[in-house]
Amino acid sequence: VPVSIREARIAGSLRAVLADSAIPPLVTALIAGALAARMAGSAARSFAPSKPLWAIGLLLFAAASAAAAYGTADGWGSVSFRIYYLTGACLCVAVLGAGSAFLALPRAVALVVFGMTITAVIGATVTVLIAPVDSAAFADLQGVAAPPNSAIGGHAAIWAIGMNSVGTLLLVAGALVSLVRRIRTGPNAAILAGVIVIALAGTLTRFGGQETLYLGQMVGLIVLGAGMEWANRRGHARKPVPPIIVA
């Protein structure tokens, strides 16, 4: 058998395994969880507003991927889908974007963004928890395919679209502003590249299987996490906030 044909068969077999197993979302969850722990540790050692928000955002990413792994391995249900939709489709990118706001925007504006994010998190959580879920949408799912967005009713889709759009805008805008100002050029270039890779991963599912999404997310997460870690190591130009003295 020619080498090219043998390699094609191996690649096809590997893709078939990835398409029918929970390995891709599980590995994605582990990577996101490790990055979240790393960011939380950095926040504990040297606090900055962006760090805990990034840690929470990465933890939400891990929760969504873990729910997808569970749904793939044991079958999707109402609970696993709600967790997947809430943490992945609604909250994750918005919280990451709120963290980036503290690096790119004036502190007063970033605090407003933070307050709006908290309000949106509460609204989205309540909406997703009480929204009706069409269990019939889970019947024909195969491999790592996730349930369609139409499986959940109410106004959940509005929260998902709005929070994802604003969060992505904050992540991209924050990186671009810093690049233009030549502030933390390397870290912000990595953050921007990671966001683009994760976004493109969803687009590439049109040309390949759902496993393409998770493989793209793995790469994007590593690049995004590296950029965040790099930015934190470079430090912040702002002066530390003085402690509150209680008389």
Describe the predicted segments one by one.
Residues A104-L169:
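Membrane-proximal helix-loop-helix units in multi-pass membrane proteins
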Residues A73-G75, L103-A104, P132-D140, R233-I244:
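A cytosolic-side transmembrane-helix exit/cap motif
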Residues A40, S65-A69, A199-T203:
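Alpha-helical transmembrane segments of multipass membrane proteins
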Residues A19-A32, A48-T125, Y214-I222:
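Individual alpha-helical transmembrane segments in multi-pass integral membrane proteins
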Residues V17-R45, V166-S178:
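First transmembrane helix
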Residues A34, A173-A247:
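C-terminal transmembrane-bundle signature of multipass membrane proteins
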Residues V1-A16:
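N-terminal amphipathic/basic-hydrophobic helices that include classical n-h-c signal peptides
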Residues R15-S21, V79-C90, A145-M163:
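Short aromatic-rich membrane-water interface segments that cap or initiate transmembrane helices
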